[in-house]
């Protein structure tokens, strides 16, 4: 029994040392009240609040972000070069597939709903109510609009 306990303690200590040597964080905790919301990336219309939970969506590697949208917030048809995993944290979020925004073809996701959108799949979205979603995927994150005129980052600034 003592020998088993000794092996277990040695294993745990070795794992902790290995985690420190790699420079990787041992864990990440996120408490909702501690989340700092800010402006979204420029490829999204104004009105959305955005936060990075883990990783760096602008670099290769895993990332987790959250987006908070008011009721009626739309995301025009677009696609991503990597898979996108979406989980609804609050509200009702709707997704549709295709190159044209068609509200009648959308599927509504309540709290806890999940969608996997494979790389290059054309899709669009609507916050049916005030909604918060969590997105995770493999960076770098990129969003390409089917119609380039829908991309707010490409528009001339309002005067």
Model-derived features with residue positions:
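Short acidic-glycine-tyrosine-enriched beta hairpin
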Residues: 56-58, 99-120
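Glycine- and acidic-residue-biased ligand/ion/polar-headgroup-sensing regions
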Residues: 70-73, 80-100
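Positively charged n-region of N-terminal signal peptides that target proteins for export
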Residues: 1-4
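Double-stranded beta-helix
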Residues: 28, 104-107, 124-159
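Divalent metal-coordination and catalytic microenvironments
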Residues: 53, 112, 133
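A short, N-terminal "cap"/entry segment at the start of jelly-roll beta-barrel domains
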Residues: 20-61, 148-159
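Short beta-strand His + acidic residue motifs that chelate non-heme Fe in jelly-roll/DSBH
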Residues: 75-77, 95-96, 117, 122-128
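Bacterial N-terminal signal peptides
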Residues: 6-16
